Amino acid sequence: MDLAFSTEENIAAIASAVAPGQGAIAIVKVSGASAKEVVKNVVRTPSNKIWSSHKILYGHVIDKSTKKNIDEVLILIMDGPRSFTGEDVVEIHCHGGLIVVQQVLDAILKQPKTRRAFPGEFSQRAVLNGRLDITQAEAINDLIHARSQKAAQLAIAGIDGDITNKINYLREKLLDQLSEIEARIDFEEDLPKLNSKKLLTDLMLIRAELKQLINDAKQGSLIRNGLKVALVGLPNVGKSSILNLLSKHERAIVTDLPGTTRDLLESEIILEGVPITLIDTAGIRETNNEIEKIGVSLSQKTLFTADIVVLIFDLSKGWNKNDQNLLEKIPKGTPTLIIGNKADLKSQSTNIQPHATMTAITGEGEKELIQELLKLAGANELEGIEVALNQRQLDLVKVAVNALDQIEKVAAESLAWDFWTIDLREAIYKLGELTGEEVTEALLDRIFSRFCIGK
């Protein structure tokens, strides 16, 4: 899909979440050079008030073919450039529910030079018209999809321009260093010699700040994307009870019968600002039951996709060879917690030291389990993070750091200044691409195609 720079037509979309038959208010948004004329053609207002910017009008959306009212609406007008997109924008606030909202949108789309917006096209136009930079637009998308308060706070920081300001600050420093080097290349005899050691030290300080952004991005990803945590163990060790305990509601059926859970059950929780998807797996064992076999197979596959595995065993039976076999099936390198459950029934000695013990049916040990889980996830390092790069931004910063690494090698080999400028330009270009200083059509396509329609 090639949507970059396609701004000649008006675009329209439903700009609010709509569920069938639900919702008090919905919004249909129109943006473009003739957005006001488009909306005027489909509404009727009781007065002849001028359609002036940042005013709200009352009226009805009309079905032109029947002359009947489609809905009673409020109309919000925002003239460009004082609008989200920088173009004329009109919002029609109508009643919620799927049918009436779609009728309003259909009436708009029947107008000349008006089409349905592509995903992210409103935000794209805001960037093209200088209302936002790319990092701010991406932060808006992050805010819409935020799964915790911490994720929302990081997104707001991005919208406020914190990422752009930080990157621009470092990029300007690199530009200053590049200008010093190029001045010496062009006017070597007229300017004092550069101190290569001091210059390299300054560049390495910039590299250190970029590396800190990389480290913060890893933690930011934890806040933004969360973790997938698999609860695994032999049948009837209490996996479902632990899922219900952490979820604070009955998500899974709990019985004394082994093999009750035969499918993967998921529940999302927020712990210390980290979104965690808990996956209750079927007890892994040899079985002749075909349905249970499918559940066991799914459980084994989950071991390879989970960010963290919580291996639960029954303290009343102790750690046995089947528990050990299951532990050995967990892929090497996957962070794993070993939790002993049914501490109230403990009667067997165990030759393994669990990270925590608990009694899921009473809630005893829940706090310790959560602490161990957060420690393993690295959540204790989340405090103090002010900005967090997304994957696109992170990849570009990594390239910039690699370019500065090359400069360090160039300096060690005492190569000419021209060699310094090659990698310095690369770092500057990549940081410019991050903020949109260096923008391409393909870049815009890639970024905004991930947005929701109507934003």
UniProtKB/Swiss-Prot annotation:
Record: residues binding GTP: 236-241, 255-261, 280-283, 341-344
PROSITE patterns reported in the protein's UniProt record: G_TRME
Keyword entries, A-Z: Cytoplasm, GTP-binding, Hydrolase, Magnesium, Metal-binding, Nucleotide-binding, Potassium, tRNA processing
Function: Exhibits a very high intrinsic GTPase hydrolysis rate. Involved in the addition of a carboxymethylaminomethyl (cmnm) group at the wobble position (U34) of certain tRNAs, forming tRNA-cmnm(5)s(2)U34.
Keyword DNA repair: no
Binding site for Mg(2+): 240, 261
Enzyme Commission (EC) number: 3.6.-.-
NCBIfam families, per database record: mnmE_trmE_thdF (TIGR00450), PRK05291.1-3 (NF003661), small_GTP (TIGR00231)
Cysteine pairings via disulfide bonds: none
GO molecular function, a single term: GTP binding
Top EC class, one word: hydrolase
Location(s) in or outside the cell: Cytoplasm
Binding-site positions, K(+): 236, 255, 257, 260
GO biological process terms, semicolon-separated: tRNA methylation; tRNA wobble uridine modification
Species this protein is from: Prochlorococcus marinus (strain SARG / CCMP1375 / SS120)
Family matches, as CDD domains: trmE, TrmE_N
Cofactor: how bound: Binds 1 potassium ion per subunit.
Record protein name field: tRNA modification GTPase MnmE
